[in-house]
C-alpha cells in the first residue's frame, strides 16, 4: 500500500496513481453484477460464468475488461470505497448540520442494504473470507474498516465538543461499537430474516449517544 494521507473527509487515504480513464458501459455493468454477487453470495461463490449469464455476454468479454478475478474484485472494492468516500465528503461538507444528522446520513446506505435482506456491506461480506482473499484485496478491506472507524471517531468528537452527544467512553471506542454494530446487524438480519434488526440497532446507538 502507498503512503497514507488525510483526505478532505477526515479519512486516512492511500496515495494512489492518477485515476484511470472512464470505464466502458460494459465494464461498469460487469462491476455492478460482481458487486451484487459478492454482497449476496460471497467472493468465492461466484464465477465469470455467473456474470456472463446475468449480462448475456461471453466470458471472453469479461476477461477483456478484467483479466483475472483478482483484478475484478480489486476494481469492485475500489469503486465501492470511492463511492463511500465521496458520500462521507458530502456529509462533512455541511458544517451547519448537527453531528447526529451526519450519523443519520452515514447509516443510510446500511438501511438500503437492509431493504434487500440477502445483501450486506461489500467489505463486510469480504471480511468473512479474508484468509482466501489476495493480499491486495485484504489490505483494501482492512483499510475500509479502519478509515470508516476513524471518520466516525471524528464525528463523535465533533458531537461531544458541540454538546450533541454525551459519550460514556472515548470517541474511538464508541466509533468501533457503532461500526461493528452496523456491520453485525446486517449479517444477523441476513441470517435470521429479522427485518427489524438494523432499525433496532440504530435506534439503540442513537439513544446511547443522547444519554
Spell out what each predicted region is.
Residues 113-116, 154, 158, 178-196, ...:
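Amphipathic C-terminal alpha-helical segment
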Residues 48, 69, 73, 103, ...:
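A general structural signal for well-ordered alpha-helical segments in protein cores
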Residues 43-44, 165, 195:
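Conserved hydrophobic residue
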Residues 75, 79, 89-119, 171-178:
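Hydrophobic alpha-helical connector segments
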Residues 101-102, 114-136:
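Amphipathic alpha-helical segments used for helix-helix packing
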Residues 1-25:
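N-terminal intrinsically disordered/low-complexity leader segments
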Residues 85, 100-101, 135-161, 173:
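Amphipathic alpha-helical packing segments from all-alpha helical-bundle domains
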Residues 2, 26-29, 33-71, 75:
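Helix-turn-helix
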Amino acid at each position: 500500500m502507498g503512503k497514507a494521507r488525510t483526505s478532505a473527509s477526515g479519512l486516512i487515504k492511500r496515495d494512489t496513481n492518477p485515476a484511470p480513464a472512464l470505464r466502458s458501459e460494459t465494464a461498469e455493468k460487469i462491476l455492478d453484477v460482481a458487486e451484487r454477487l459478492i454482497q449476496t453470495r460471497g467472493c468465492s461463490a461466484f464465477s465469470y460464468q455467473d456474470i456472463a449469464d446475468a449480462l448475456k455476454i461471453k466470458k471472453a468479454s469479461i476477461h477483456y475488461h478484467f483479466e483475472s478475478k483478482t483484478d475484478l474484485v480489486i476494481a469492485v472494492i475500489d469503486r465501492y470505497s470511492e463511492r463511500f468516500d465521496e458520500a462521507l465528503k458530502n456529509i462533512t461538507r455541511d458544517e451547519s448540520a448537527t453531528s447526529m444528522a451526519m450519523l443519520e446520513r452515514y447509516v443510510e446506505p446500511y438501511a438500503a442494504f437492509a431493504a434487500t435482506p440477502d445483501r450486506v456491506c461489500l467489505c463486510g461480506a469480504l471480511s468473512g473470507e479474508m484468509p482466501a482473499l489476495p493480499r491486495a484485496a485484504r489490505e483494501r478491506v482492512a483499510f475500509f474498516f479502519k478509515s470508516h472507524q476513524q471518520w466516525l471517531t471524528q464525528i463523535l468528537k465533533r458531537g461531544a465538543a458541540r454538546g450533541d452527544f454525551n459519550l460514556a467512553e472515548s470517541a474511538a471506542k464508541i466509533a468501533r461499537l457503532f461500526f461493528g454494530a452496523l456491520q453485525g446487524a446486517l449479517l444477523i438480519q441476513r441470517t435470521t430474516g429479522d427485518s427489524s434488526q438494523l432499525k433496532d440497532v440504530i435506534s439503540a446507538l442513537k439513544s446511547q449517544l443522547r444519554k
